[in-house]
Amino acid sequence: MPANVTIRIQEADFDIAREMAALTKGRADIGAVVSFSGICRGSEGGETIAALTLEHYPGMAEAEIARHAETAMSRWPLTGLSVIHRVGRITAGENIVLVLTASQHRQAAFAAAEFLMDYLKANAPFWKREESAAGTNWVDARSQDDAAAARWTKS
């Protein structure tokens, strides 16, 4: 993995501004940074959600994210990227995921960020359990996430 690629899976929260500064520090070749931050919603389908618990397959999750990061780095002219995904119990309003992509121009940064998030939502080995007043339930994959990820497949 190139030195300008950061992939972390962690329980602790992250600071978006600090992560962006780390990606761009000392880099005069960056003209655009696109960020996506996913935040835990407090409701789903009209039901109040107290928290999410995210689990992952250690080692495999990092390797799969790294593989897609390498694809993004080779597919678009990026100068760097960061993917940070939290695991453990996350309450409403807290950060879940951060994707940062840096490039000389915005188009590549936008496309790569969207590609990475589509992959994370559809295929990354994470499992999500919702907690509500009604109890807990595992969240199933959504077909629209699969469709979004499929559009990036080269034929």
Question: Locations of the language-model features?
Answer:
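Short glycine-rich or small-residue beta-strand-to-loop segments that form or flank ligand, phosphate
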Residues: 96-103
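N-terminal, polar/charged subdomain of small-to-medium soluble alpha/beta proteins
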Residues: 1-96, 110-114, 118-155
